[in-house]
Amino acid sequence: MTAVRGRRGVRSVAAAGLACGVLLGATASPARAQPTDEHHDQMTGPAPELLVRAFGSVDWGATELPGVSNSFALGQFDLFITGSLNDRVGVLAEIVMESSGDNTRVVTDLERLQLTFRVNDHLQLAAGRYHTGIGFYNAAFHHGAYFETPIGRPRVFSFEDEGGVLPIHEVGVSARGTVPKTESALHYVAEVGNGRTWVTDESAEGRDQNGSKSTNVGLSFAPERWRGVEIGASFYRDTILDAASSDVRHRIAAAYVVYRTPSAEVMAEWLGLSHQTADGRLFRNHAGYAQVSRAWGLVRPYYRLDRLAVSPSTPFIGDRGSYQAHIVGLRVDPAMWIGLKAEYERTDEAGHHGINAVRTQLVFVF
C-alpha cells in the first residue's frame, strides 16, 4: 500500500472548477452575462490589497548512494499571498511550483488557502486548506526554504508527496488563540479536517473517504518574560480506510521544547505514531529531531540529529523504513533575503549504513 499524493485532490478539484467556469462562460448568452458584469462594476469601497512574496532555491547535492550522481536542482518556487478584506477578516494563499523529475515539466500545487476571521486575541476562526498543527515544526515552517536553517525538513515532517508519514496538509476548519487570564502566555489550537487519504480511490478523490473526521488539539506555553521559549504538545486522531476498506485507528502525539531568537536556536521535538487495525493489532512508532544553531554576524553554524523509527509491518507507512542522520552545516547570509547553506550528512537507513553526503542550497526572497 502506498500513500496517495496529498496534493492530488486539490489539483483535480481546481481543474474541474476551471473547466466548469470555462464551459459556463462559453455557453452563457450576452443577456445573461451582462448583469454579472454590471454587478461587478457597481462594487463599492476600496478593493482588497494583496501582499505577494516569492521564495525560491537552487540546490546541489552529492551522495555515496550507488547509482546517484551529483546534480543541481531547482527547489520549490513558492508564492505567498496575503490580503485583508477588513480589520477582522484576512485571506492567505500559498501556491508552489516545482519541477517534476528530470524534465522541465512544472507541477503547480495549492498548498494553503485560508479565510480567517479574528474575533479577538482569544479566538480566531479559519476555514480552508492549512498546515496541521501537529507539534511545532509543521506550524512554524511552511514552503519557504529561506526560513529554515538547515537544508530540508526533519524526515518526520517530510511533505506527503515526498514520502512523509504525517498528514502535513488538511482541508477543514480551525480555531486558535490565547487562553484568557494567562497574560497571553498559553496558546491553544483545535482543528477538524478530512484527514489524509492513504489508499487510491478515484471515486472519492478530493473528499474524505469515510465519515470520520480528523481532529487535532494542541497547547503551547510561551511566557513573555522568557522571550524565545516555547513548550508545547499536541494530539491528533483519525480513522483511515485500508485497502480492504477496514478502519485503522491513527493517533499522533507530539511534544516539543524550543528556544529561538535571532542569534540562537535550540529545538527538540518527539512524536509518537500509533496505528490500530480492526482486528486489534497495535503498531507503535516514534520520530523526532534535535537542532541547534548560533549566529555570529552573517555566519550561522548548525547541527541536527534526525531520527525516524518505523516498523516494516506498520500499515500505510511501513515501507518508509527507519532512518537516522547527523547533519553539520554552515549558513551564510551575505545580503538581506539571500542565504547560502552548505552541509555534511551521515545517514543510516534500511539497506544503507554510514552513507556520506554533501549538499548546498541557495535561498532567496523577492
Task: Pin down the residues of each PLM region.
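N-terminal periplasmic/intermembrane-space "pro-region" immediately following the signal or transit peptide
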Residues: 2-5, 17-64, 366
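Small-residue packing motifs within transmembrane alpha-helices
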Residues: 11-17, 21, 228
